[in-house]
Amino acid sequence: MNRFNGLCKVCSERRYRQITIRRGKDGFGFTICCDSPVRVQAVDSGGPAERAGLQQLDTVLQLNERPVEHWKCVELAHEIRSCPSEIILLVWRVVPQIKPGPDGGVLRRASCKSTHDLLSPPNKREKNCTHGAPVRPEQRHSCHLVCDSSDGLLLGGWERYTEVGKRSGQHTLPALSRTTTPTDPNYIILAPLNPGSQLLRPVYQEDTIPEEPGTTTKGKSYTGLGKKSRLMKTVQTMKGHSNYQDCSALRPHIPHSSYGTYVTLAPKVLVFPVFVQPLDLCNPARTLLLSEELLLYEGRNKTSQVTLFAYSDLLLFTKEEEPGRCDVLRNPLYLQSVKLQEGSSEDLKFCVLYLAEKAECLFTLEAHSQEQKKRVCWCLSENIAKQQQLAAPPTERKMFETEADEKEMPLVEGKGPGAEEPAPSKNPSPGQELPPGQDLPPSKDPSPSQELPAGQDLPPSKDPSPSQELPAGQDLPPSKDPSPSQELPVGQDLPPRKDSSGQEAAPGPESPSSEDIATCPKPPQSPETSTSKDSPPGQGSSPTTELPSCQGLPAGQESTSQDPLLSQEPPVIPESSASVQKRLPSQESPSSLGSLPEKDLAEQTISSGEPPVATGAVLPASRPNFVIPEVRLDNAYSQLDGAHGGSSGEDEDAEEGEEGGEGEEDEEDDTSDDNYGDRSEAKRSSLIETGQGAEGGFSLRVQNSLRRRTHSEGSLLQESRGPCFASDTTLHCSDGEGATSTWAIPSPRTLKKELGRNGGSMHHLSLFFTGHRKMSGTDLTECDEASRKRKSKNIAKDMKNKLAIFRRRNESPGAQPASKTDKTTKSFKPTSEEALKWSESLEKLLLHKYGLEVFQAFLRTEFSEENLEFWLACEDFKKVKSQSKMAAKAKKIFAEFIAIQACKEVNLDSYTREHTKENLQSITRGCFDLAQKRIFGLMEKDSYPRFLRSDLYLDLINQKKMSPPL
């Protein structure tokens, strides 16, 4: 092998290995982990990779002579899968250095200590690894290889073994950290280094747990009989860092709160499957507080025994298959994003709620005793509150929310710049009511007695610093030197503002609406600001996330707020010749400008007690534009009455009068688009979210959770995944590429008025949808007359179909279905008693014809209708009798629902997918049985309970008995 990157031939052969691996029947026989660079996680015994010489912990630098050192693990995995026959890897091998141990054993320590060394130039690496000063503890992330004369070489995936207890002479090492199952390489194990390194605290102190009112039961000492109760803490073996490295002594990590006394406990081994991301369980900020054996409800009557590990910031659900060995069941639940429902004091059940795919899911757990439930709930509620106080409330902006929906703090007359802010209290009240749209108060420890009253304002600052924060939705004070480049996009909230003492002010109460003032939105937070919650936004974040000051808002101007749940009417913002505004899809187009109707202005004046702000307010002109699919108006519709800054109230009334005559047809089928933006449906409005576009602009894009399907990454088997697959970590990178357009789509209301202007001929309407053809004036007139005479009926029908995209769809959960299929099922509408039977089981729901239709309509709102479609396709497949038709239908079902990157791919694990693929070699009626059972179980555990709680189902079981038809 020649030289690589300046190393001599000897060093190159020691450190770099070029390995050719041929594909076997089960893939290449190894798994990978980590990002930038990617490392070999495990090598199958006897597989192609092991025969070729690949070893665990090898760092992949090149794949087929392409540099991949900075690739992500998912990207490299897809690239390896796409290689048909063989791959050529250039790897950097960790070469052990032999060093005598304390008792004559051999301690092998990796010469390349960290990812920091791997990213440095090879010549620097060689120097640093052999002769340089020892690397700082915070740079040591690599795995150490420890060899003892009796125990042999130990090598684990994410384990950090080291030399422990040199002074005391301890050299006890755990068994080889590989799963005991001989054929399953998809597990890695995190084992404690020393059997005495975990402690059990079995009981809470009786005088520390608050007793519930009305209960006479005292907290009894429950000493863990039958392994039901385990309150644990981990002794952290660390010295300046969170790994098992270079620790000469053991020191315990004292918890923040005491749940009981210390009792020794045999160590437990946590087994992480490959689909679960391993955790740094030795992080000094992460303390194991509690371990309890509970019952987890997997169905209505099906339970399983699980072991819950409660850390200071997350929960781990595990199952103890063997004594002392816990398999992790799923990804961890972080306490800052979960909620606890304790239920009644007599019931032993309690629930843990979390968000998945923007929908609320829950785990139902059952304790073995009241004491155990009280202990677990006390620990969880205490730490959930602690973590959520540190976390900023997430910002969720909807598709049709407008600038007027921002929370604004009203200013009070007589308040000057010298007004003082109330100091927030440090003791939160448990029963405090939070403002709408927020899960936590923005202040650190607010109390209800010190919230800002209605009408009290924060003093305007002449020159606010970029790191200052304002309460959610409040206008920023005017700045002395505003610049157009400081403008931020509409539709994002402001983070809470901190005063000079470092505490945040509480948000203002809800107040009446003022839709003529645009508020200053909040810039998107960078990962640095989202992870470091305690530091102000100005620190540790990129310059683009700093909060600039807003311009164009006088300090003494009255501003009010509107509750976004009550009304989302898009504001009509006047426009001057010197300023061009960016609009949301529900706002007015550049060709139709006007102020609010007089009725809305009158209501606003009455409710707020102040006259509305003048419509001549000028807003800045340099906001980035949304990128929206273009539906342009033809030039024939741009014949306005001259360019003017804003239309008068009389013009608005005249246009309203025109609409009154034209709106009769729209009222026939309850699909009027006048109030298109007034609806607050979370499912509809959350389909689109804003994201960074090219050249600093902002674009509308489909939410990541809707575009992505979950894939099992169990092994590197050959699957034809498309090169454009976007993983969880790389999905956002594909949105900001390409050129952007600066044209903004008009609102449906504006479009309706625009199409009705200037006569509103059918030809004008058809040109809008069929495109503009440039012709001379004479030819255009002749074609107009001819087309009107020949195709008026066809065009009218076509127009009605195409204009339907701008009408409000009647998709609310409690509304009556409107499609043809739903109309045919109206005659089968069940009674309340029949609908109540659907709650007994999912089978009874699917056997009922109307129930099947209703459940399918509900799944469409949940964006998971492919699960039911797959189940129904499998049922139809079992009814096919012809073998040839059965083979064709089986391939169609596999390609449509099971194949990776299929158009309606269902969520199956890799084993089920491979098993179904093998069944297609010899097609029978039961070749989809396993996949069908998995999807049925998924619907039964996930979608079916949500359906029973939905408004659609509740309306059916609570429907009033109608009088019989005549």
Swiss-Prot record:
Biased composition regions of type Acidic residues, renumbered to the chain: 649-675
User: From which residue to which does the signal peptide run?
Assistant: none
Keyword Cytoplasm tagged: yes
A GO term from the CC aspect:
plasma membrane
Q: In which tissues is it expressed?
A: Detected in embryos from E8.5-16.5 in cortical ventricular zone, dorsal root ganglia and cerebellar primordia. Isoform 3 is detected in testis and in spermatocytes from newborn mice. Levels increase and reach a maximum after 21 days; after this they decrease again. Long isoforms are widely expressed.
Q: Which example biological process does GO assign this protein? A: G protein-coupled receptor signaling pathway
| Chain positions found as Omega-N-methylarginine | 167
- For the keyword Cell membrane, the answer is yes
**Domain spans labelled RGS:** 841-966
| GO molecular function, a single term | GTPase activator activity
- State the CDD domains in the record: PDZ_RGS3-like, RGS_RGS3
Write out the ranges of the annotated region (Disordered): 115-135, 403-618, 637-704, 806-830
| Residues modified as Phosphoserine | 712, 715, 747, 776
Q: Where is the composition biased (Basic and acidic residues)?
A: 676-686, 820-830
Q: Where in the cell is it found?
A: Cytoplasm; Cell membrane
Q: What does its PTM field state?
A: Phosphorylated by cyclic GMP-dependent protein kinase.
Sum up the protein's function in the record's words. Down-regulates signaling from heterotrimeric G-proteins by increasing the GTPase activity of the alpha subunits, thereby driving them into their inactive GDP-bound form. Down-regulates G-protein-mediated release of inositol phosphates and activation of MAP kinases.
Name of the protein in its database record: Regulator of G-protein signaling 3
Q: Which organism is it from?
A: Mus musculus
Q: What's the source species' lineage?
A: Eukaryota, Metazoa, Chordata, Craniata, Vertebrata
- Give me the gene this protein comes from: Rgs3
